[in-house]
Amino acid sequence: MKKEDVKYDCSFFRGHIPCAPNKDYDAQCDSCTYYEKNSLQIKHLNNSSSLLKEIYEICDFRDSKKSFEPINLSQNFTKILIIKLGAIGDVIRTTPLLEKFKSEYGLCHFSWITHSPEVVPVNEVDLVYKWDNSSVAKVTSSNYDIAINLDKDREACMLLSLIKAQKKFGFLWKDGHINVATKNAEHKLITGFFDHISKQNTKNYLQEIFEICHFDFNGEEYRININKNLSNFWSKKIGKLSNNKVVIGLNTGCGSRWKTRLWPKKYWISLINILQKKNYFCLLMGGADEDEMNRYYRDKTGATYLGTFGLEEFISISNNTDIIVTPVSMMMHIALALKKQLMLFHNIFNIHEFELYNRGVIIEPHSGCDCYFGNVCKREKSCMNDISVQDVLSNIVLLNKNLKNK
């Protein structure tokens, strides 16, 4: 399947995710019988003013009418702009590119625009912009050597088209729809359109984004901000609470969106009780969406629950665990960035997507999963019931051995 065969003018086309006929019937544009032509799906934006106006309308921005001076740097620096707006975990898992660009280009000046500036590593990125009208105006007023967009949202694609750069990688807006800056992004574009093609993918996410930037992935690590003072504070506190036992961070949820990834409550309770009998220190973790559930687990098991925290403090607490058990979530990316031993629950995604750097194990239902990228289970009984407590325990034992062999 080639990008030229995609029916961007179809009523069912959803921008960058699978359409209903593909989700339901594995329909594919070049042989689809559900195609309904709709010219309104195509939006030609052929100049800078139309692109900028569309971004502002999509994001409900107001034009400040303010002009900004471009960034002036020594010619010895390669000026690189990264557009990665997405979820916090997505931003974190883009950071390995920093190391690669520095190794290939030497002195680099990085700018990064995102919804989540708090996780962009400030000691490695020179200018961090929070996505708003002012930031869009600033980055579009500057000239870059390289600009990269790894998001498929319309506004991100339009921004890359608007940016002035000698080289562009990733996704942009061209011919009235999402498109690719170079052919290397086509694989990632097509797997996003069609579930049945995505299921056949054997590349992990880092291989994909490195390929988009015309690199090979060679194990470059995540980068993350750690507040050393906060981390030291929690080191002392958790050290006292745990009495120097192996600390297992149990991230029990995955936000409000993906309920299909949840492991059954009775399994969590059983796991915690057994771990505590085996002299592990269980630390319940999560965000506001998991607060009520974690209080329930605390009351049922006596496990430690410290409450909910801002992201900076949550990262500091996570930094003082030894092993982290979690579904696919932001916590997975934090654990990888902190180089923790990781046990990852997996069901609804492509298992090849995940790079654990030889520091973790992936556990999935032996019965498989019928809900590819789905947030509603298709079965009477969720496949997550088929991941046994004993399987999880066995993997934790393996991870504990890894700790001892470090």
Which positions does each model-derived feature cover?
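Catalytic machinery of carbohydrate-active enzymes
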Residues: 1-406
